[in-house]
Structures are given as C-alpha cells and as structure tokens.
Regions:
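C-terminal alpha-helical interaction modules of replication/initiation AAA+ assemblies
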Residues: 2, 6, 14-160
C-alpha cells in the first residue's frame, strides 16, 4: 500500500526507497501488481463518483475537522463507490478514506492517466505471469518510474 500511495502522490524517490526495502525481503511481484491495480482502480472509481456526485466530494474536501458526521457520511459514500469499503464498515472510514489521502490523490490524475496506468498494470502483470518480463528490482523500478511520470509520458507521447 505504501508504494502505491507514494506513486499516486508522484513521490518517486520515496517509491524507490520502498522498492529497495521490498526487495530485501521475500518480495513477490504479483502481489504488488494486485495491490497497485486495486489502488489505481479505486482512484479511477473515485474520479467517476466525484463527477456524478460533486457535492459529496466537496463536502468531504471542505471539512477541516475529524469526527464530523457530514465528512464521515461523505467518506463512507466515497469508500463504497470506490470499492474500498463494504456495507457496514463505517469504522474503517478514517484509516481507509480520510487518513490515506486517496480522494486527494485521485484529483492528481486525469482519466486518461489512470486508464494508461491500468493498461500498463495489465501488460506488466501478463508479462510477469507469462515469463516475458522478469520482475527484478530494476524492472519494478522502471515500471514504477513510468507510473510516477505518467503525466509527462502522455504529454510527450513517449512510452504509451
């Protein structure tokens, strides 16, 4: 989760440190890909929800207080829409939606950027699973660099 979060905040140096740490353990790349896909799919769904329900997201983003019932309600709706929360999981609102900053992260990406990242994830996943890509530390670093720089890569027409 920390790696996906660092990349969604476009903090590549932090992501590199996390990758180095992961590869010093019994790291399994398909689990990372799965976590990334869940994270970026949630970002995409949050953007779709925000487009259809701008007032809910505005309520969520405009609050400054913790334990505000309006914010908790908005966060719960966002969590359900994104697939990060299930019915009855109100107690998870703070760590999953509020503290994680996922709504703010979703605002940092365009739909095109998120679709591109999701496509790259599918390609990387298929490549790893078929043996076309070896999930070495270097390959994972390059892949994460692409994600962190998706905006620039799309603008330049490079590597998409």
């Amino acid at each position: 989760y920390e790696l996906a979060s660092a990349l969604s905040q476009k903090q590549f140096p932090k992501a590199l440190a996390i990758i180095n740490s992961l590869f010093s353990t019994d790291f399994y790349a398909p689990l990372m890909i799965s976590a990334f896909f869940r994270h970026y799919w949630a970002l995409f769904r949050i953007r779709r929800f925000a487009e259809a329900n701008p007032q809910v997201v505005k309520t969520f983003l405009s609050s400054r207080g913790y334990k505000d019932p309006a914010v908790d309600g908005a966060a719960y709706e966002i969590g359900l829409a994104s697939g990060l929360l299930q019915e009855g999981e109100q107690r998870k609102i703070y760590p999953v939606i509020i503290a994680s900053g996922i709504v703010q992260a979703a605002r940092k990406f365009s739909d095109e950027e998120l679709k591109t990242v999701l496509r790259w994830l599918l390609e990387f996943d298929a490549g790893v699973k078929t043996g076309k890509i070896e999930a070495t530390e270097h390959e994972v670093q390059l892949f994460c660099f692409r994600i962190a720089r998706v905006s620039e890569l799309i603008r330049s027409g490079t590597d998409i």
